[in-house]
Regions:
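Iron-sulfur-associated redox domains of electron-transfer enzymes in respiratory
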Residues: 2-173, 181-186, 190
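Ferredoxin-type iron-sulfur electron-transfer modules in oxidoreductases and energy-metabolism complexes
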Residues: 151-171, 186-271
Length: 271
């Protein structure tokens, strides 16, 4: 669900700035991957000295979560280039789940990562229907209440035929822009199945349906951290987050596993 309301929360955080200042000045980290305000725009930035921290923001500009980026995905690239250095990174609840999952897949070394957590406001938690809208440790914000999965429940209430028709209708809107894959912090395969001609032929719009989205849903098993960036990136407004929430519910029911809620590795990592 995309938030529509006006949101007037300040985007600066003294607590966050103080924490990152301590980490940089003490030499605990080489840099801090967070969000930077620049002439009214907010984007990812690697802060390497204290003087830059006047531009450090939490990302809530006009509404909660309106300036979110897959920081963990950027962190993987930074860590590959500087494997001996330790970096801090700004995390919300979903980002922290992503880090924990990436550790189990050996994409990041936990000894070289210092997460700095902020809690999501209740408005954002409600819109995301998030089960854990905060990291384990927060330097800013109040821990919001976990939310019911109302959207998934409403679709579950439909008949099999109506559910099938709903998803087929949604999938036909796809223009195969790969936005969902490219923004996903948990897509890190060296060779992408949904980009392979052997499985899904390129150059066809709309893509072969429903194989494209069902293949991606299978690959989200044991990986999806429910960050919702796929929803935000989709120009066709396909409710991809709802699809992956349902997949996550099935895996939780059958295997008692949700990515990032523990240090446990996915029981389905063979996929």
């Amino acid at each position: 669900t995309k938030l529509k309301s006006r949101y007037d929360k300040k985007i600066m955080s003294d607590n966050l700035k103080s924490k990152v200042t301590d980490l940089l000045s003490s030499g605990q980290i080489k840099g801090f991957l967070g969000l930077r305000s620049n002439e009214g725009h907010i984007g990812p930035y690697l802060f390497t000295n204290e003087a830059e921290l006047d531009h450090l923001v939490i990302g809530d500009w006009q509404r909660p979560g309106d300036s979110r980026y897959p920081l963990n995905k950027f962190l993987i690239q930074i860590a590959c280039k500087y494997p001996e250095d330790t970096f801090g990174v700004l995390v919300r609840g979903c980002d922290e789940r992503g880090l924990k999952t990436l550790y189990t897949w050996n994409q990041l070394n936990p000894a070289k990562v210092v997460p700095v957590g902020i809690a999501c406001p209740q408005e954002l938690a409600d819109a995301c229907e998030c089960l854990k809208p905060y990291p384990d440790e927060c330097v800013d914000g109040q821990k919001a209440t976990a939310c019911e999965q109302k959207t998934v429940s409403s679709i579950d209430a439909l008949s099999n035929a109506d559910r099938f028709a709903l998803w087929i209708k949604e999938f036909t809107k796809c223009i195969k822009c790969y936005g969902c894959r490219d923004v996903c912090p948990m897509c890190f395969c060296n060779e992408c199945s949904v980009g392979s001609d052997d499985l899904i032929h390129t150059g066809h719009i709309p893509p072969e349906m429903p194989i494209f989205h069902l293949t991606r849903a299978v690959h989200m098993i044991g990986r999806c951290i429910d960050c919702g960036l796929c929803n935000e990136a989709c120009p066709a407004d396909i409710p991809l987050r709802t699809l992956y929430k349902k997949v996550a519910d099935i895996i939780d029911k059958e295997f008692q596993y949700r990515p990032g809620y523990s240090d446990q590795k996915s029981p389905l990592n063979v996929l």
